[in-house]
């Protein structure tokens, strides 16, 4: 991470789909016969290229591929898993909510003989940019949230145990490909904070043997810009500060910086990626406000251990808003960085 400046500005993972690409994804799902393999790859590459350009134009120091090949941040991975049967959607009408996401039934032991698709994503984005990259990886507990055990697994924890080695193997393969920064996405733990010691054990085994800088992202849900849990990290501390990762990526902006004092409990060498832009709000934060929020963060943790991010990924945000929010965030960071280094 030595190549990054003080207070690196970055995204969490996903970028907003361009309108044309969102339409392509819908059509490719409904009428797959309309597109060949080359057509699909061309569309994905063009979308990734735009995601890269948007992030770099805004001034981000560390970027992703925008998760352009994924559905939300984790739903696309079920296509790589064997042993699942899709379940019918119980509610199709009315206001969108988490119950309208895809659901699957486990009908055989879970396996991923082709991996989870992350290596292909990384190889593609590496051909398109030499910029510093991080790769978000869905955590096994969060992946288990859309699965029912059926006659194969007793409960969500057993499903998690089955997914854990698949995620671990994918992370190790990414490291062999040259990835140095991995982000483990486990928002479900923030929404179910009642078993913190069990959570720490699952995290430790998920990242065991993975030789990379690992960030642990825990928001409170952002499907259709809605949270899905009680928005407090307090039940997870001080346990969370002992997680077997190098950084915690946490949501603060949407909560008006509530609980930022918990950053005091994050001891070196662990760092904090502080969410300072609210993606549940279409209002564009002025750079001065981002700078003010960042100065608040620095009251509790030293600048050398801080990255600055939005609260969550941009997949649920219109692209024209996402570009403005990221640019404002970067400018707010620049103001504080200039103040600290002048």
Which residues does each PLM region occupy?
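Domain-level signal for soluble alpha/beta catalytic cores
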Residues: 1-342
